[in-house]
Amino acid sequence: MARIAGINIPDQKHAVIALTAIYGIGKTRAKAICAAAGIAEDVKIRELSEEQIDKLRDEVGKFTVEGDLRREVTLNIKRLLDLGCYRGLRHRRGLPVRGQRTKTNARTRKGPRKPIKK
């Protein structure tokens, strides 16, 4: 297994799909990385030479991925909480942040229903 950005990349998958195992890299970015490294998208990771894997590592290194990206997202949410702005309050209360309705629905964010005790 090749190791890129601290993640073991699955050998048996195509390069584009394997790169999506890294947090912060989706299909579009994976295709761009493969193109920049000069690697065909349909080549499996186990068929790549060590030099090609190093090129992939260099290309992935240009982006914020994995732990750094998770930390950045967490700090952004923490900043909103500290500011006390509307979005921060919604995060604090565990409600939808982007204007979705909450009278019905929003169960994913709110969690399971709590029964009313009489």
Swiss-Prot record:
Part of the 30S ribosomal subunit. Forms a loose heterodimer with protein S19. Forms two bridges to the 50S subunit in the 70S ribosome. InterPro entries: Rbsml_uS13_C (IPR027437), Ribosomal_uS13 (IPR001892), Ribosomal_uS13-like_H2TH (IPR010979), Ribosomal_uS13_bac-type (IPR019980), Ribosomal_uS13_CS (IPR018269). It comes from Histophilus somni (strain 129Pt) (Haemophilus somnus). Residues 94-118 are annotated as: Disordered. One of its GO terms (cellular component) is small ribosomal subunit. Keywords: Ribonucleoprotein, Ribosomal protein, RNA-binding, rRNA-binding, tRNA-binding. Belongs to the universal ribosomal protein uS13 family. It comes from the Bacteria. One of its GO terms (molecular function) is tRNA binding. Located at the top of the head of the 30S subunit, it contacts several helices of the 16S rRNA. In the 70S ribosome it contacts the 23S rRNA (bridge B1a) and protein L5 of the 50S subunit (bridge B1b), connecting the 2 subunits; these bridges are implicated in subunit movement. Contacts the tRNAs in the A and P-sites. This is Small ribosomal subunit protein uS13. PANTHER family: 30S RIBOSOMAL PROTEIN S13/40S RIBOSOMAL PROTEIN S18, SMALL RIBOSOMAL SUBUNIT PROTEIN US13M. GO terms for biological process: translation.
